[in-house]
Regions:
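N-terminal pre-domain/capping segments
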Residues: 1-90, 189, 299-374
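Hydrophobic faces of well-ordered beta-strands that scaffold small-molecule active sites
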Residues: 3-9, 34-36, 64-68, 103-105, ...
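Active-site beta-loop-alpha junctions enriched in small/polar residues
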Residues: 8-12, 37-41, 69-71, 108-110, ...
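Acidic (Asp/Glu)-rich catalytic clusters
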Residues: 23-29, 45-65, 90-99, 131-135, ...
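Charged helix-capping and loop-helix junction motifs
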Residues: 47-54, 81-88, 119-125, 175-178, ...
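A short acidic, helix-capping loop that chelates divalent metal ions and anchors anionic groups
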Residues: 72-77, 111-115, 199-202, 238-241
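Active-site acidic/histidine proton-transfer and metal-coordination neighborhood
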Residues: 74-192
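Histidine-acidic metal/acid-base catalytic patches
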Residues: 184-194, 198-375
Length: 375
């Protein structure tokens, strides 16, 4: 199962602030991907740095990704939509230059539209045009000049257009809406922002079973196996995301997702980007938790295999042998607990006798109490 972790931006610990230096640091940390943030706009001076990063990613198989402008209004009036599409055009050009595998976009508020099929169909038509424009910009094999500058256009597919789940009730982007749209537009993929899904569901992702239901829904409605995920802690209220937090300070935990990916994720091709304020630190934490979950799974499977072999040798059913092991463990626990309780009783200190008042001190206990006193 391809599974990659990385930060959303140049690592905080990187001494240099260029993308190439950030890629070197990310690789040294044992991570395999990153997401470049074009949160507001892309200027011409960025493109030389993007091209250098694209060459490095092509030669090293380092996965590059990009996030388009944060503010979007694809469902607004014609003027607002055109302004958003112009920003998307520039980011699509940058995605080609940097050899991005995914580029993530927000859709924006519902505006005057209502949630439903009509709105989703309208958005699907817009995104179909975005995909077609991306393929035009990507170039073709016959363009020698394009091939000389961007050799990956011959080997790699055009950038996938990612449609992100939103974290506000007023914004388009529930999981159902995203899956319905990407299922009808080839060249798009769902971007599962787990913090946003958790917030809109009022804290819905708490166990590995919750994540299992999420991915089962995606598999049934979308049918693909390639997923691009954002993960971070989140502070939320009333079904709305407030702001990102570090993982250890949120009720959204990565351990249940790590457990699910270790046990059921063999069919997935997953990229997980850390949106946490700690960036690469929480990306490394997620990788460590996944490795721990994988190790526990291997140990459990080895134990089950050993139990199965012992059961065959003893002529027992493996379930019967498991029941015996559990009973023996219970008896051992009880045998250890009983002496501990006995020792605790023996060690209990005797109650101290009340101290006698000194002769040179006033003894208030001998005086009659006045029932009228408040204190």
């Amino acid at each position: 199962m391809p599974l990659r972790f990385g930060p959303a931006g140049v690592p905080l610990s990187c001494k240099g602030r260029t993308i190439v230096e950030g890629m070197d640091d990310i690789t040294a940390l044992g991570l395999e991907t990153m997401e470049i943030q074009t949160v507001r706009t892309v200027t011409p001076q960025h493109f030389n740095e993007y091209w250098q990063a694209g060459i490095l990613s092509w030669k090293s198989d380092f996965e590059m990704n990009m996030h388009g402008p944060y503010y979007a209004d694809l469902l607004g009036d014609r003027r607002s939509r055109q302004r958003t599409l112009m920003k998307m055009e520039t980011s699509l050009q940058a995605a080609k230059v940097i050899n991005a595998r995914h580029i993530t976009y927000h859709v924006g508020p519902y505006g005057e539209r209502k949630a439903g099929r009509e709105t989703n169909e309208h958005l699907a038509n817009i995104l179909q045009g975005v995909v077609e424009r991306c393929h035009q910009l990507w170039g073709n094999e016959e363009d020698e000049i394009d091939y000389a500058a961007f050799p990956w256009v011959l080997e790699n597919n055009p950038t996938l257009i990612g449609v992100e789940t939103s974290g506000q009730q007023s914004l388009w982007g529930t999981l159902d809406e995203v899956l319905e749209v990407v299922n009808h537009v080839e060249g798009t993929v769902p971007v599962l922002n787990m913090a946003h899904i958790h917030a809109r569901g009022n804290g819905s992702l708490r166990t590995s079973e919750d994540f299992g239901e999420l991915f089962d829904q995606v598999r049934e409605q979308y049918g693909g196996k390639t997923f691009y995920c954002h993960f971070s802690g989140i502070e939320h209220r009333g079904g709305n995301a407030m702001h990102y937090t570090q993982l250890k300070k949120s009720d959204l935990k990565f351990e249940p997702l790590a457990e699910y990916l270790a046990e059921e994720g063999d069919w997935l091709d997953v990229t997980v980007i850390s949106d946490s304020p700690l960036l690469e630190h929480d990306a490394m934490y997620m990788l460590q938790q996944y490795d721990k979950a994988k190790q526990k799974l291997l140990e459990r499977r080895a134990l089950e295999e050993r139990r199965y072999k012992l059961a065959l040798e003893a002529g027992l059913d493996p379930a019967e042998l498991l029941a015996r092991e559990q009973e023996q463990a219970r008896l051992r626990t009880g045998a250890i607990a009983e002496p501990a309780e006995t020792e605790a009783k023996k060690a209990k200190p005797a109650a101290k006798a009340p101290a006698k008042p000194a002769n040179n001190r006033i003894n208030f206990e001998d005086e009659d109490e006045d029932e009228d006193d408040i204190f």
